[in-house]
A protein has these predicted regions:
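ADP-ribose/adenylate-binding Rossmann-like module
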Residues: 230-244, 414, 557-596
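Glycine/serine-rich phosphate-binding loop and adjoining beta1-alpha1 elements at the start
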Residues: 63-104, 366-470, 602-612, 616-617, ...
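Active-site rim beta-loop-alpha module in soluble metabolic enzymes
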Residues: 152-217
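Rossmann-fold NAD(P) dinucleotide-binding segment
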Residues: 221-227, 537-538, 548-563
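N-terminal basic/disordered segments at the start of proteins
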Residues: 1-25, 294-370
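Electropositive, gly/pro-rich neighborhoods at or near active sites that engage anionic ligands
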Residues: 7-138, 142-151, 298, 307-313, ...
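Adenosine-phosphate binding glycine-rich loop
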Residues: 253-323, 333, 358, 364, ...
């Protein structure tokens, strides 16, 4: 029987002894903790020397390879020198392989998990292999080595900085004079005075990160305030450690340590066992030796969820002021607007269009029934629709790309475009080609939400029946039918309504759309018109989806009583004063979506927990982990409209209470439209009046 001894600088309370079989050979494993006493560790090494076939050193500084620098810690070298005739290892060779594999395994298993994640290394030199692997998926790497080494509240923010820091500090780090100077600094009154500030700065860095890499012992000072929702990459996660993670609300743990005899063991122990089993020193072990052991034992990283399955994905969404009036709601512009004439505010509106993007609000609390969560940021670009349309596409492209750069830095894995930012130029295609993360316009869910809301409203008013074909026995019109959202609404309405009318000032595109719909939906009755006015009086349902930027696109006084108008456009196609003229018509502001969970964000002009459909599409894709360019350009695929609708249902999205320009519609509002429409019919039909 071969004997492997693990001499640890950790607590002796965790000592154990076990016998097991390894690579077909019987092994005895002995763990001896020395409670941080280096002299005691030397004595233990001397005492176990006659019986040990290999020795592992645990909870002591490893020999690190960082860039081209090889760090050899003098205390580790001192212990290794105690037993020159026996293989001694810290597990560095195997640890590097398991660390890197843990990252690649997790990224493959969970898909895009580390994309743009903000990662904090409590010891970057020890986690260098992890950092190199993560750098393939994110540039948002931070290293707290200056905190731990010198108590300096400064984070390194790249692998290059870590390598430079190591190159500069390694020659003096372990010199006796340097060690004394550092200890003296840590015990000086000046350092004690700023110690809380340094500690608070590190705690803040942990709270702002998405992934934490470090030993379990390095995490002890952090609470659920910092660790809630975080992913921790560490080793030797026992049941008690998992309970500790659970109490801190950690979302996920990646444990790269190997298991043996039903328990996690130190990587140093496993490498010492390999060395003893193969009768080679750790320096003589090669890649094939490690691969044979890993595969024969079935060792793989563990992905653990302390509080049940929980995955937190991240998004960004670009918004902008929809009118000059929106600018007056933001300090200090609210004060300026109160004392300035319109001419000054016009200049302010022009100036604000040139401001760089900034974070308007953090979004949190979105939880799917499946266990996924989404958090994100609303990023504002300054241009109103008037200013956006007054400039060429490149003006807006440059601001959207700046927003995408900010989103990536924040950790977003996908970015959505809102309102007029998604109709400029080629409707997102150019931005997606240049952006450092996936882009979606949200138009697929906007189309879905518009028809969802219209269908629900028509049913609740109850004036249109279902015909023999199974479709709505009535007429529906799409105004702005050749646009991105309008064309998809037209395709879907053709499958749900017996007769549809398409209105847009682009005859050639209308004819092509009509032809396409008739091929997709045999038997569909499709009419086309250059404007809405000619046929609007006969419609039971109207969807407006123009980019008119406030221009009047239909005469509401000609609309049929009881008609449901869904206004998808932003800014709205139908102004509030027009809506007030027709109490017998229901004008709804497209289909806003009720988000799952307990969403928290600043005011976006909707009731709490409700989002515009384009924002909801970005959130649905985030919850689904579909980090791809989903909806781009003006020709939306109706298959994607259907797909995003199904994904939304899966993640708990619901049609919100239908709203109009004056807020949420009540049952009394639907009844009012129903009654007034019936009265209008009676007044228009003398025979009906006589019968009454």
């Amino acid at each position: 029987m071969k004997t492997v001894v693990s001499v640890s600088q950790g607590s002796s309370d965790a000592d154990y002894e076990l016998e097991t079989e390894f690579l077909g050979q019987p092994f005895r494993i002995l763990r001896i903790g020395t409670d941080g006493d280096l002299s005691r560790a030397e004595a233990v090494l001397e005492s176990v020397r006659p019986q040990a076939d290999a020795i592992g050193l645990s909870m002591i500084h490893d020999h690190y390879q960082v860039g081209r620098e090889q760090l050899e810690h003098p205390e580790t070298a001192r212990l290794e020198a105690c037993v020159p005739d026996i293989p001694v290892t810290t597990g560095a060779g195997l640890r590097g392989i398991l660390q890197e594999w843990a990252i690649r395994h997790t990224q493959t298993e969970l898909g895009h998990f580390f994309d743009n994640a903000r990662v904090l290394f409590l010891n970057g030199q020890a986690g260098y292999r992890i950092a190199r692997s993560l750098s393939e998926h994110t540039e948002n790497l931070q290293f707290a080595d200056p905190y731990l080494d010198f108590g300096v509240p400064r984070l390194l923010t790249s692998l290059t900085q870590l390598e430079t820091y190591t190159r500069l500090t390694a020659p003096v780090m372990f010199q006796p004079m340097a060690v004394k100077a550092i200890n003296a600094l840590h015990h000086s009154p000046l350092y004690r005075l700023g110690e809380k500030l340094v500690s608070g700065s590190l705690h803040s860095a942990v709270q702002d990160s998405h992934v934490i890499v470090g030993a379990v012992g390095d995490l002890e000072s952090f609470t659920s305030k910092e660790l809630d929702g975080k992913t921790v990459i560490t080793s030797r996660v026992t049941d008690s450690v998992l309970d500790w993670m659970r109490s801190r609300k950690v979302a996920m743990v990646v444990d790269y340590s190997p298991w043996l005899a039903g328990r996690p063991i130190g990587v140093n122990v496993m490498e010492a066992m390999i060395s003893a089993a193969l009768s080679r020193t750790p320096e003589q072990l090669g890649p094939d030796d490690y691969l044979d052991v890993i595969q024969s034992l079935g060792i793989e990283p563990r992905i653990l969820y302390p509080n049940g399955y929980r995955r937190v994905n991240r998004f960004a969404f670009v918004i902008h002021p929809l009118s000059q009036q929106y600018l007056t709601k933001t300090p200090p512009l609210d004060w300026i607007s109160s004392v300035s004439p319109p001419a000054v505010m016009n200049l302010v509106e022009k100036a604000v269009a040139y401001t760089p993007p900034f974070i308007y609000s953090k979004v949190s609390g979105i939880r799917s029934p499946t266990g996924e969560e989404a958090e994100g940021w609303l990023i504002t670009v300054g241009g109103t629709p008037r200013e956006i349309m007054a400039h060429g596409p490149e003006f807006t492209y440059s601001r959207l790309l700046a927003a995408a750069k900010l989103a990536k830095k924040l950790g977003a894995q996908i970015m959505g475009l809102g309102a007029f930012t998604k109709v400029v130029g080629d409707a997102g295609i150019t931005v997606a080609k240049r952006a450092p993360l996936p882009i979606t316009t949200g138009n697929s869910y906007s189309a879905s939400g518009a028809l969802w809301a219209a269908h629900d409203a028509v049913k609740r008013i109850g004036r249109v029946s279902i015909g023999e074909s199974g479709k709505m026995a009535g007429k529906a019109m799409v105004v702005g039918a050749t646009g991105a959202i309008g064309s998809v609404c037209a395709r879907l309405l053709a499958k749900a309504v017996e007769e549809i009318y398409l209105a847009a000032p682009e005859p050639a595109k209308l004819l092509a759309l009509k032809e396409s719909i008739e091929q997709e939906t045999p038997g569909a009755i499709v009419h086309v018109a250059g404007s809405a006015d000619r046929d609007v009086a006969d419609m039971d349902m109207i969807v407006t989806a123009t980019s008119g930027a406030g221009k009047r696109i239909l005469d509401i006084m000609r609309v049929k009583p009881g008609c449901v108008i869904t206004d998808v456009a932003r800014p709205l196609d139908i102004p509030a004063e027009d809506v007030a003229k027709r109490p017998d018509v229901l004008v709804i502001e497209s289909g806003e979506i009720q988000l799952p969970g307990e969403p928290r964000m600043k005011d976006i002009g909707l009731p709490a927990g409700i989002a515009y459909a384009c924002l909801a599409e970005t959130i649905v894709l985030t919850l689904e982990g579909r980090f791809e360019n989903f909806t781009l350009g003006r020709n939306i695929e109706w298959e994607k409209v259907r797909e995003i609708y199904k994904m939304g249902l899966k993640h708990g999205m619901e049609l919100a209470s239908i709203s109009g320009v004056n807020g949420v519609f009540s049952e009394e509002d639907f009844e009012r439209v129903r009654v007034l429409a019936a009265q209008s019919e009676d007044e228009a039909d003398p025979q009906a009046v006589a019968a009454n």
